[in-house]
């Protein structure tokens, strides 16, 4: 509750942990599209947004549940591989819409090295979207492919089968052995890349001309 004449009640979205208004202000002033990454306890979602006088315009977007519904993803929808694939998908859609450059907007998420928000960034970079960044924050390749999850699952299956079935019940219910997650990741990634093959070829051709 507010106390004192100088106390200012934070704006609603700041109180809800959704918006850092100062960072948003700086990014809007830049005039560049924002590559917005957000996560919940269940999902990852990514949007490419352009600020207009009348309000924000979403140019492209992707949600991790799309991976399940459209691309046959059998793994979790909030982990590092899912974040990467969601970022990849959103970036390809942005490129298709003619957006080639954006600035990263992670809102109030902590910029922890290797975090899921940076896995989404890595997906966008691999798609060909140009986003200023530091290489140090990006997750290592083995984490993006889910090898750490597969290794943990294999260990757990051997040492504690009951806990293994409990921890990976979602994977098993969908018909995926978590030990096979890296291979499954590559399959889904290739599906996405194949769908946007023409976009990727166009980006490569334009890059070759500029070079």
From Swiss-Prot:
One BP annotation, GO: translation
GO MF assignments: 5S rRNA binding; structural constituent of ribosome
Keyword ATP-binding: no
SUPFAM superfamilies with a match to the protein in the record: Translational machinery components (SSF53137)
InterPro entries found in the cross-reference section: Rbsml_uL18_euk
CDD domains given in the database record: Ribosomal_L18_L5e
Keyword RNA-binding assigned: yes
GO cellular component, one term: cytosolic large ribosomal subunit
Keywords: Ribonucleoprotein, Ribosomal protein, RNA-binding, rRNA-binding
One Pfam family linked to the record: Ribosomal_L5e
Assembly information from the UniProt record: Part of the 50S ribosomal subunit. Contacts the 5S and 23S rRNAs.
HAMAP family to which the protein is assigned, alphabetical: Ribosomal_uL18_A (MF_01337_A)
Protein purpose: This is one of the proteins that bind and probably mediate the attachment of the 5S RNA into the large ribosomal subunit, where it forms part of the central protuberance.
NCBIfam families associated with the record: PRK08569.1
Family: Belongs to the universal ribosomal protein uL18 family.
Protein name, UniProt field: Large ribosomal subunit protein uL18
Organism: Hyperthermus butylicus (strain DSM 5456 / JCM 9403 / PLM1-5)
